[in-house]
Amino acid sequence: MSTVWYDAEFIGQKVEVAGTNRFWFKLKSDSPVAYKPGQFFVFDLPSGEKRADRWRSYSIANIYDGSNILELCITYEKGGVASQYLFNDINKGDVVKCKGPEG
């Protein structure tokens, strides 16, 4: 089965506790993207030139409801380029690529 890449629009974030935020992304797809508990998506973030700097895997934190909205719960990693982007640089409406679900 081939991997499908989606555009994911950043729609918001909320501080859960100090250093951990919830993030919401809306997958742009003509049909619902189904996933199961325990699965994850790989995000290609604009945080470097090499794939190892850009690709991050995040477990899905919400139950599938057909809305194509992914909720992620992410802990800030000091010095982490992906953390810098997600916690400080991303803006509502920004679009990143992601693939999945996997796992």
Show the residue positions of the predicted features.
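Ferredoxin-reductase
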Residues: S2-D94
